[in-house]
Amino acid sequence: MAADTPKTSPPDDAFAIRPAVREDVASIVRLIHGLAEFEKLTHLVQVTPESLAPHLFGDRPVAEALVAERAGRVVAFALFFTNFSTFLALPGLYLEDLFVEPQARGQGIGQALLEHLARLAASRGCGRFEWSVLDWNEGAIRFYQRMGATVMPDWRICRIAGPALAAFADPPRG
């Protein structure tokens, strides 16, 4: 390129995907709150930057995150962790949450995050890349199906949390 060629700045809708760093935790928490609002689950959110940071960047991290940044602002995140398939005898990559701010949607950010995670899963020798979707989120379901994902109709999520978890972990002895 000639020295007198003007430098162009990236378009306003340009974004970059990168691994999250500790300094992104407050932005990730902000986006988690946005996700909870979208899912109508704000009453369940307890996360704070202080409670999340050790799980992503502590001595024994249990999850990882990617962020999408546009014009210096984190506008999307994907939080994921390794699981394991006994049937395949291979690790898997499980996407816990992905959220793109409403004003940043429709620009390929969500798909780019998913493609990045798929490449990461393949490079780590994972046999599966999985996630859950709310049954009422028909737009997301159609999007995932167009990508080639199978929405598993025969499976349901089971969860024990809070007081029920404590009670089950320490049953009365008799």
What are these regions (language model features)?
Residues 16-28:
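A short beta-loop-alpha structural element at the N-terminal edge
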Residues 29-55:
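Conserved GNAT-fold acetyl-CoA-binding loop/helix
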Residues 54-67:
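A short helix-loop-beta-strand connector motif used in the catalytic cores of GNAT acetyltransferases and
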Residues 67, 73-82:
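Conserved beta-strand in the GNAT
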Residues 98-105:
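A short, internal acetyl-CoA/4′-phosphopantetheine-binding micro-motif in the GNAT/acyltransferase core
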Residues 106-119, 146:
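Conserved acetyl-CoA-binding loop-helix of GNAT-fold acetyltransferases
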Residues 122-132:
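Conserved GNAT acetyl-CoA-binding A-motif
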Residues 131-140, 159-163:
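Conserved beta-strand-loop-alpha-helix junction that forms the acyl-donor binding cleft
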